[in-house]
Amino acid sequence: MSAVTQVVETAIGCVIPSCIEFGSSMRIATSLGSPSVTQSPCVNRDVEDIARTARESIRFFLAELSIECVPYTQDPALEAQVASATRCWPDRERLAPHIRTGIVIAATAYAHNSLATRTLIALYTAIGVALDEPDILESANAIGFHHSLCTETSERPSAILDEWRRILARMWDHFPRFGASCILTSTLQFLNMTMLENETKGKVLNRTAMPFVEYRRMTDGFPEVYTAFIWEKGRFPDVQVYMQAIPNAMRFINFGNDILSFYKEEAAGETGTYIHDRARLTGLSSVETLREVVEETVSAWRQVCEILGEGIARDAWNSFVRGYVTFHVHNPRYRLSELL
């Protein structure tokens, strides 16, 4: 997610972000520059071979989900609300690409939520994505953020973190107590892991460190946050309706991004990814690992569907999945138009 988000106009006038990322996993989005052991043999494969592998896996993935993506359409009401809310943000020009990212993810994956909730999601995402960039994170002085929440101090957080804190405080107005608390704790985990990643770049993974790779993947990409966003309090006040689906929904969010990012990462020769780290530590090729991840992600999706059963909670999940995939498929950053 360290890439600068750009916005392009399509021939029919739809605005589509070309470099969206929301979180490591959104690396929604994603690997936060995971440490590498060595270059994967997949990097040197012919681009056509990479494309063939990715095409087969992604087509299988989408077919299993029965996803039919629709073109991204703008949400004027959402854009107006976000523009008003961010008008006085500090350093707004620098944050503008990330604000666009927030709008698009809210308009696609969370289209089933109310306008007020979509607006809050867009604002939260804008700052979260911005803080995934090392220079912005450093300038925000995030290192003292966690401690400041537990102490009485006159030292206030940076302007951008203070804005994020105010946004976080509003989560209880839009999500059940459990969901809002998950958003807070997951946010703190993201910041903590992101700072650790920046402090330990180049650290070689121990061959027995697979549990750490899994742990890092679950903490550096907001999966719990973006799962909690699916079910807003106004329509889903009782968390018991969906709570057992949360772990598998988190896996779907993380691994879904890994699958849909695979082609552009392989074509660019990127090796600091979850799939590459997992392949190295398990002794498999990245192609074999991709296929495993696809199977695990489809399984997670099925289990969420089974747990939710029929009804509005399942409808919200289906809407999220369709929008989440659309976010990737119609985003030029992921280069999926070259495959599908």
Swiss-Prot record:
Motif range (NSE/DTE motif): 257-265
InterPro entries: Isoprenoid_synthase_dom_sf, Trichodiene_synth
Function, in words: Terpene cyclase that catalyzes the cyclization of farnesyl diphosphate (FPP) to a single major terpene scaffold whose chemical structure is still unknown.
Record keyword Magnesium present: yes
Heme as UniProt keyword: no
Domain notes: The conserved DDXXD and NSE/DTE motifs are important for the catalytic activity, presumably through binding to Mg(2+).
Binding site residues for Mg(2+) 2: N257, S261, E265
Motif (DDXXXXD motif): 132-138
EC number: 4.2.3.-
Gene transcribed to yield this protein: STS-29
Protein name (database record): Terpene synthase 29
Alphabetically ordered keywords of this record: Lyase, Magnesium, Metal-binding
